[in-house]
């Protein structure tokens, strides 16, 4: 059975192997101290766990994933620096989000870092965001749902049998 830890591990491996992602974090987004992250941590892939649906034969894990970067405000003339940096940030982080989705969607190939038993539900809607901390972060968030086998096997449950 593919566990919650396994799915988080796939995301972490994708972040580690991707040439443009510099760090991976998971947990509740409101618990992150963005101000403690350094410039070398960006681009960040962040996975916030959502609900899990336990169904007959299928377990569905839901995550909101964020791909975020600091805005480069050194590009362009003064009135346009932030706008140009934001557009570039949106473009680059959306491409990275598509790469993450491709790893899950094409997990049946031998080149994916995701187990072939994991099925990503499509379509996925991505939403742009910009947040101001000590720096200006921009990127995309998307809620993903991944289905895995759920054996629902009472024989292997660590419970005393009703005899």
Please state what every model-predicted region is.
Residues 48-50, 132-163:
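Charged, low-complexity C-terminal accessory regions
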Residues 1-9, 56-58, 67-108:
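Extracellular/virion structural assembly segments
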Residues 23, 38-42, 89-147:
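Acidic-leaning, charged glycine-interspersed low-complexity segments
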Residues 57-74, 135-148:
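Oligomerization/assembly interface segments of phage tail-like spikes and tubes
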Residues 1-58, 107:
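Small/polar-rich, solvent-exposed N-terminal microdomains that initiate assembly or binding
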Residues 63, 83-85, 158-162:
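Generic alpha-helical propensity signal that fires on short helical segments
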């Amino acid at each position: 059975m593919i566990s919650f830890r396994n799915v988080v591990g796939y995301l972490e491996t994708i972040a580690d192997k991707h040439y443009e992602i510099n760090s991976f974090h998971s947990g509740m987004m409101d618990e992150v101290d963005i101000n403690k992250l350094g410039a070398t941590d960006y681009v960040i892939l962040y996975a916030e766990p959502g609900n899990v649906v336990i169904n007959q034969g299928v377990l569905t894990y839901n995550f909101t994933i964020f791909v975020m970067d600091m805005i480069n405000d050194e590009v362009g003339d003064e009135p346009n620096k932030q706008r140009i940096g934001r557009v570039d940030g949106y473009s680059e982080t959306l491409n990275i989000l598509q790469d993450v989705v491709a790893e899950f969607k094409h997990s049946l190939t031998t080149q994916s870092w995701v187990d072939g038993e994991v099925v990503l539900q499509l379509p996925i809607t991505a939403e742009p965001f910009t947040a101001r901390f000590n720096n200006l972060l921009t990127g995309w968030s998307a809620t993903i749902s991944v289905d895995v086998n759920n054996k629902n096997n009472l024989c292997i449950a660590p419970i005393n049998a009703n005899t």
